[in-house]
From Swiss-Prot:
PTM annotation (N6,N6-dimethyllysine): residues: 135
Keyword Nucleus tagged: yes
EC number from the UniProt entry: 4.2.1.-
Protein name per its UniProtKB record: Chromodomain Y-like protein
Disulfide linkage: none
GO CC annotation: chromosome; cytoplasm; nuclear speck; nucleus
Modified residues annotated as N6-methyllysine in this record: 135
Provenance organism: Homo sapiens (Human)
Domain Chromo: 61-121
Gene name tied to this protein: CDYL
Pfam families found in the cross-reference section: Chromo, ECH_1
Length: 598
């Protein structure tokens, strides 16, 4: 086959000459007219075209191999040809159609190119593989040890026996390394003096990072969970305060909180007032429903802590570069008083105190008298120390689900009137703590706020909400009257019509709707919620504490007495409802509906 084309030759790339391609398979021959070719290899088997037979014939150029491949501006494939007998400076780019008789060279180049790509991919994989990194470290360590160890030069039977024993011991140690790590996680820390509390999310579902601990720790990767459940060395070295608590409370304080029970126990059949036999008469009877509550309750369910290894203990400064919501999986206990808290986490920050709801005695950060007392204690401590303000948030994807009705019903079966009085008194003291607190209270609502969890928000000074949060006060559905001074504050901030719609019909408000009605100050995007909150909190904490406190006093001076009176009225009504058979029946019906929904 003969093909004519105009290209830059291998001898003069700036001069255009006619190249003629012909010859047997796997050969590419170039002939330059009227120019003598440099010395090079020739092939006597090459035939010359008839029109060139009379002229002086330069030696034919033979393809040695294909060096590279590219696409030209027109999208056509070109190959970089290495000519036999010439160096790399004389390589030329040839179109694919010029190499029709050189298919074997092209196939060989494509094969080598594919193998190089596979090798490069394998190399990158090996470089990024942690197992490979460990193997390389192990190899380098062993090689260095063999080079530097003087004992490697000793030869003898005694030495061999010693080396074999040492090798067997080392192999045994390596085999037992992994089980020792897992067994170390189950060790009992009660005797070690190390006091830790690792709060976990009370919500089972795992969601995206949308605020303060929006991910459930139970569903995190084991590696990630192990990294987050660490304790700073300052915590491990602190003085034990186990004497302050009883044995049960000590175990509960140190324990983790697996969510092995549903929000309400499964009870076959409908729940009616008839099931609570004796409740309507003297409040001391029992029922199958209450037996199920007692058997399946989660109040006293605690387990030992999973354990902490020394290698995982890092200073808190090492975590400054991590997102704030990740660092909330553990609490830094800097004072002995912080160890008293089981259902909340308290962090003393620079200029403010951070209180996080992380209930172990209830589900979904619900409020019972124990949780309320701990929040009150933390607020009292913050009021007396140098904190300029308080940040209130929650661990998990739920901010607060209101009152813990399972806790209430379990205790109302003993003495309904006495227990209803105690519970109403607990709510009254809890709400009064917010009313009388002199320093600013900032709330970061990362998820749903229901019942009392929503009604206390107007008692705080600033409320920032995650866009995924929502607000609802379905008191009529609960079978109870409003609480948390919502009968006064809701009409003031959103008007009578909207307040009645929330308090009577239980309308659910989105974060944007709550912001529009004045219940929420600002709404932030879930992905940057914690960052936005912390930036603003630090700005407030940099202000003069006297100015902050006096400014709040001026805003609340005309409302304090009115709120205390409203709180007193609401608690009296709650005590009356909870002490009646109708109120108990309504609460049981609500729990039955929750069971059916679950």
């Amino acid at each position: 086959m003969t093909f004519q084309a105009s290209h830059r030759s291998a001898w003069g790339k700036s001069r255009k000459k006619n190249w003629q391609y012909e010859g047997p398979t796997q050969k590419l021959f170039l002939k330059r007219n009227n120019v003598s070719a440099p010395d090079g290899p020739s092939d006597p088997s090459i035939s010359v075209s008839s029109e060139q037979s009379g002229a002086q014939q330069p030696p034919a150029l033979q393809v040695e191999r294909i060096v590279d491949k590219r696409k030209n501006k027109k999208g056509k494939t070109e190959y970089l040809v290495r000519w036999k007998g010439y160096d790399s400076e004389d390589d030329t780019w040839e179109p694919e159609q010029h190499l029709v008789n050189c298919e074997e060279y092209i196939h060989d180049f494509n094969r080598r190119h594919t193998e190089k790509q596979k090798e490069s991919t394998l190399t990158r994989t090996n470089r990024t593989s942690p197992n490979n990194a460990r193997k390389q470290i192990s190899r380098s360590t062993n090689s260095n040890f063999s080079k530097t160890s003087p004992k490697a030069l000793v030869i003898g039977k005694d030495h061999e026996s010693k080396n074999s024993q040492l090798f067997a011991a080392s192999q045994k140690f390596r085999k037992n390394t992994a089980p020792s790590l897992s067994s170390r996680k189950n060790m009992d820390l009660a005797k070690s003096g190390i006091k830790i509390l690792v709060p976990k999310s009370p919500v089972k579902s795992r969601t995206a990072v949308d605020g303060f601990q929006s991910e459930s720790p139970e569903k995190l990767d084991p590696v990630e969970q192990g990294q987050e459940d660490t304790v700073a060395p300052e915590v491990a070295a602190e003085k034990p305060v186990g004497a302050l608590l009883g044995p049960g409370a000590e175990r509960a304080r140190m324990g983790s909180r697996p969510r092995i029970h549903p929000l309400v126990p499964q009870v076959p059949g409908p729940v009616t007032a008839a099931m609570a036999t004796g409740l309507a008469v003297n409040g001391k009877g029992t029922s199958p429903f209450m037996d199920a509550l007692t058997a399946n309750g989660t109040t006293n369910i605690q387990t030992s802590v999973t354990g902490v290894t020394a290698s995982k203990r890092k200073f808190i400064d090492d975590r400054r570069d991590q997102p704030f919501d990740k660092r909330l999986r553990f609490s830094v206990r800097q004072t002995e008083s912080a160890y008293r808290y089981r259902d909340i986490v308290v962090r003393k920050q620079d200029g403010f105190t951070h209180i996080l709801l992380s209930t172990k005695s209830s589900e979904n950060n619900s409020l019972n008298p124990e949780v309320m007392r701990e929040v009150q204690s933390a607020l009292s401590t913050a009021a007396a120390d140098d904190s300029k303000l308080v940040l209130l948030s929650a661990v998990g994807s739920v901010f607060c689900c209101g009152l813990d009705f399972i806790y209430f019903i379990r205790r109302l079966t003993d003495d309904r009137k006495r227990e209803s009085t105690k519970m109403a008194e607990a709510i009254r003291n809890f709400v009064n703590t917010f009313i009388q607190f002199k320093k600013p209270i900032i709330v970061a609502v990362n998820g749903p706020a229901i019942g009392l969890g929503a009604s206390i928000l107007p008692l705080c000074d600033v409320v920032w909400a995650n866009e995924k949060a929502w607000f609802q006060t379905p008191y009529t559905t609960f079978g109870q009257s409003p609480d948390g001074c919502s009968t006064v504050m809701f009409p003031k901030i959103m008007g009578g019509a909207s307040a009645n719609e929330m308090l009577l019909s239980g309308r659910k408000l989105t974060a944007q709707e709550a912001c529009g009605k004045g219940l929420v100050s600002q709404v932030f995007w879930p992905g940057t919620f914690t960052q936005e909150v912390m930036v603003r909190i630090k700005e407030l904490a940099s202000c003069n504490p006297v100015v902050l406190e006096e400014s709040k006093a001026l805003v609340r001076c005309n409302m304090k007495m009115e709120l205390e009176q409203a709180n007193e009225r609401e608690c009296e009504v709650l005590k009356k409802i909870w002490g009646s058979a109708q109120g108990m029946d309504s609460m049981l019906k609500y729990l039955q509906r929750k069971i059916d929904e679950f």
